[in-house]
A protein has these predicted regions:
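Extracytoplasmic ligand/sensor domains, especially the bilobed periplasmic-binding protein
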Residues: 116-212, 263-268, 274-281
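Hydrophobic alpha-helical
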Residues: 125-130, 236-258, 381
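Extracellular/periplasmic periplasmic-binding protein-like sensory domains
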Residues: 255-326
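Segments of small-molecule ligand-sensing domains
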Residues: 312-324, 335-387
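Extracytoplasmic "Venus flytrap"
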Residues: 38-47, 51-72, 94, 100, ...
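Short, well-structured alpha-helical segments in soluble
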Residues: 93, 97-117, 173, 222-235
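Signal peptide-proximal N-terminal region
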Residues: 70-91
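Hinge/beta->alpha junction and helix N-cap segments in small-molecule ligand-binding domains
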Residues: 92-100, 145-149, 160-167, 187-196, ...
Length: 392
């Protein structure tokens, strides 16, 4: 039986909007979250109470169900091994897709009331930047997905892909293999695309290419006609995309529907099988993605993870792509670091986390000076799946 859970005041995982699933019959149900129940107080040392802040609504809400499932699976496995430092994991999920002030107030209330021992999450970086202001120095905070790098806030641990490992080799490969020289950048208007683009422009220049244009689009924007007109006029070899979640789906659909898919390549970052499903098989020609995880990775660690995921949530559960699956990685990382530190206090935990090796569905991951080192894969969209073509 999976670990006890609680859905925070923002509610449980919602279905995506009807337009997102138009033409598809695959279910995104499959979360095994139980009915809400009060969590134990922090004074109960037999329980380790984790508050997982995850997108359950808004553009990042498409990853919510798989994020919940991946968290529950990791917690169940760890609890069967005796928990973390002998403490059974309990998870409370809180939505980050709504008003940012409400999200930070929830975190602040948890800290003030001793309502959680640890905060984790696979939310967007804008949420991380806000949460660390109220969490840092009080309880440990573990951030799991791809991000812009450079997180050094005391008490905050980040284990996702960063621009140097994710983007640089993919840009070099497209330059050498596809003769890509002319690039156009488009991303959501928040910190991950801002800082990632700064690094990406250097990588493109180093590879001998040049950037024709750059755009940042408000989160939740559904009309990309002006951006697409400018892209069409610029005639780039590659459009590099850092749009988030459902926003990426809308853009990529419109991109293909306007016939641009046959004229230029696309390279995306926060792209996984969930997003690919939303884009649709007919709209993915020339679409590449660089990531530390794909569902079809042919490794023993991933085979075990996929088998356990399907056994726990069923064949039609939401696919655990890179964003959702990072929640599984996070708890596996926490288990290793806590065991090494012998404590869940911030100082020893952070000391142990700075240089450590752990095993997850991605295989062996090395953390050195707080930065995750992992194999990065370049994949090409093939209908509703990704075909892995290169490991860096």
């Amino acid at each position: 039986m999976l670990s006890p859970t609680h859905i925070g005041k923002f509610g449980g995982p919602s279905m995506p909007p009807e337009w997102l699933l138009k033409g598809f019959s695959a279910s995104i149900a499959g979360s095994s979250a139980q009915a809400p129940r009060p969590l134990h107080q922090r004074g109960d040392r037999s329980k380790l109470r984790i508050a997982n802040f995850v997108g359950l609504s808004g553009p990042s809400g498409i990853w919510g169900p798989a994020s919940i499932n991946s968290s529950l699976l990791a917690a169940s496995e760890i609890n069967r091994r005796g928990g973390i430092l002998g403490r059974e994991i309990e998870i409370a999920f809180h939505d980050t897709g709504g008003d940012l002030d409400d999200v930070t107030q929830t975190a602040s209330d948890l800290v003030a009331s001793e309502g959680a021992d640890i905060i984790t999450g696979s939310h967007i970086s804008a949420v991380r930047v806000a949460l660390r202001k109220v969490v840092a120095g009080h309880i440990p905070y573990l951030y799991t997905p791809v991000y812009e790098g450079g997180e050094r806030t005391p008490g905050v641990m980040a284990i996702g892909e960063t621009p140097g490992t994710q983007w640089r080799p993919a840009i070099e490969w497209l330059t050498n293999s596809k003769r890509a020289q002319r690039w156009y950048l488009i991303g959501s208007d928040y910190v991950w695309p801002w800082l990632s683009h700064k690094a990406i422009k250097k990588y493109i220049k180093d590879a001998g290419g040049h950037v024709l244009g750059e755009e940042f689009v408000p989160i939740g924007e559904h009309d990309h006609s002006r951006q697409l007109a400018r892209i069409r006029a610029a005639k780039p070899d590659v459009v590099l995309i850092t749009l988030i979640g459902a926003d990426s789906i809308v853009f990529n659909r419109a991109f293909a529907e306007q016939g641009l898919g046959s004229r230029m390549l696309r390279l995306a970052g926060a792209m996984d099988e969930t997003v690919l499903l939303g884009i649709g098989a007919d709209n993915t020609d020339g679409l590449y993605c660089a990531s530390g995880y794909f569902i079809d990775m042919a490794t023993r660690a991933n085979d075990i993870f996929r088998d356990q995921y399907q056994a726990s949530f069923g064949r039609h559960a939401p696919p655990p792509g890179s964003i959702g699956q990072s929640n599984y990685e996070g708890l596996r990382f926490l288990e290793t670091v806590a065991s090494r530190a012998g404590s869940l206090a911030i100082k020893p935990l952070l000391s142990a986390a700075a240089n450590v090796e752990y095993q997850g569905a991605r295989g062996r991951i090395d953390i050195r000076r707080g930065n995750a080192r992992m194999p990065i894969y370049l994949a090409a969209a093939n209908g509703l799946d990704f075909r892995l073509i290169k490991q860096f």
